[in-house]
Amino acid sequence: MKKTLLAAALLGSFAASAFAAPSVTLYGVVDTGLNYTHYRADDGKTASTDTFSEQSGQTASSRWGLRGDEKIGSVTVGFNLENGFNSDDGPEAMSRLFGREASVHVAGKYGTLYAGREGKLISTAGAAAMGGIFSPFSVLWGDAGIKAQTGTDWGRIDNSLTYVSPSFSGLEIRAQYSFKNDGTKTGDENSSDVDRYAALGVSYKNGPAQFGLIGDYSMWKNVAKATENVDNGFSVIAGGNYDFKAVRVYGQVNYFDNQSTLVNSVGGLDKFTATTSTTDEKGNLGYEGWGISLGATAPAFGGTVIAGVSYRDAEEVQGDNEYKRWEAALGYTYAFSKRTNAYAGVTYAQQKAEMKDKDQTPSAVGVMAGLVHKF
């Protein structure tokens, strides 16, 4: 729904010409729910923990945004500014006013070019994202999210250019490059002093079938003597979904090498995984491995049932530790209207850590329920 007057009020610090744009739209999503998690460390000293809390964005990230466009001759120029926030207690989710997206784009007969802060091609954030092709749980739903089934980063990048081609009988090509992944870090853009990123994706959609292939390449910064010759990271993911009317089936397989972290979402499974926060450490503790997942959605009882299973096998490139993870999840959504739906879900994740000194098999059970409202 277009809310031009309210959008103009929120944009009071912008140029007056923006107020008159008839296509400026204010939009948003609020997802608030309850979550119970049982975590078992299996380290011989840590007791199992049970947590019950109110949470934001369990199945749809809470956000608000402004978007608009203007037709200029044969091209369309537009923008998207999107803020993420925690609906359970109010603060910004990414310590930035427009942390989810801040971009401008130009669209014409030769495709669309985006510039600014965008979601990666492999993510589910932004108009160019392809992540929704591979899993019915997207990157959310706790441990069910596909980000914990791969070894790549499903986040966002600053200082980026993203190109999306026109559709050729259902076939689209996407290309993306970031001159500097994180604009808050020091270092000159497009230099070896900063992390950079490149990706190429191909998608195909024809009737009930949709498929995707993405390859991405992470160029780690080389500012420390110990890691100046560290290999860059890359990953490949291929998969898709097919609608059989009674059920839509999803599947994907992926491979990664020298990637920075193994993402773990719910239950504290990252407590034993050697995740790191700096690129220098990322290089030394990069991971190699593969993952696979299967999922499905089906109409039931007036709503939609969502189910999935997955497996990921990873090892340190320059170490001895290995991590084998599998997950299973079941969810349900019920729409009261086009704008409001309720959800419930249960997830189970187990990761066997085969380490030099000892082995661990921690696990987590998550139960969630909540309400999503869109405006």
What are these regions, as identified by a protein language model?
Residues 1-23:
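Gram-negative bacterial Sec-dependent N-terminal signal peptides
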Residues 193, 199-329:
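Detector for outer-membrane/organellar transmembrane beta-barrel domains
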Residues 74-77, 110-114, 170-173, 208-213, ...:
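Repeated loop/turn-to-beta-strand initiation elements of outer-membrane beta-barrel proteins
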Residues 4, 48-62, 97-100, 155-159, ...:
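Residues that define the transmembrane beta-barrel architecture of outer-membrane proteins
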Residues 21-36, 51-182, 194, 203-210:
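Outer membrane beta-barrel
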Residues 362-375:
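Outer-membrane beta-barrel "beta-signal"
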Residues 30-36, 79-83, 117, 175-177, ...:
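Transmembrane beta-barrel strands of outer-membrane/channel proteins
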Residues 12, 68-70, 106-108, 165-166, ...:
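Residue-level signature of outer-membrane beta-barrel architecture
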